[in-house]
Amino acid sequence: SRLMAIGTFAQLKTAAANWLDRSDLTDRIPEFITLAEARFNRLLRIRDMETVSTAITTTAGTREYNLPTGYVQMKEFHLSTDPITSLAYITPEMMSRLWAGSGTGKPQVYTIIADKVRLGPSPADAYTTSMLYYKAFTALSDSATTNDMLTNNPDIYLYGVLLEAEPFLMNDQRVQLWATAFRQAITDVQDQDNKDRHS
């Protein structure tokens, strides 16, 4: 069988079906893709995931704001003042202890609670913010046929998908090979990204 490109949702489904060689699992491949995406979004923190959002402008007296869609982890957060005001992360417990009152001012710290960012103190004014954060890769689907992860690292996708099929592949010797290949690809990508940041 000839090797095929893996650059779209459809091509990934076909490649996974070819590798699995189990026609009874073909309908489940989109589920395996979703599970693989959840797995690598948890494991990786690379530049392809970095996104800047300036969507939050504070409202006087409002201390909690929704995190952006796809938010995974904060990298840097500041008020776009002149000079900028960097916001330091503190734990939710510290936030409750230090900023429980109704006082307002220029925010100095933030914490994350569920899907919200909470500022301390509560803003006294409207401030534009800038948030550099890690965003989950856009999930593949019939309408979102590719993303940066599939374009740059099709091996992570393929081995991740094959690995998620494991519960259906009892005693299949290939599973251990796929697990090793997946872990190695994740490590390689993270290591390369770390090197690129320091060169």
Regions found by a protein language model. Name each.
Residues R2-S199:
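Glycine-enriched, solvent-exposed interface loops adjoining structured elements
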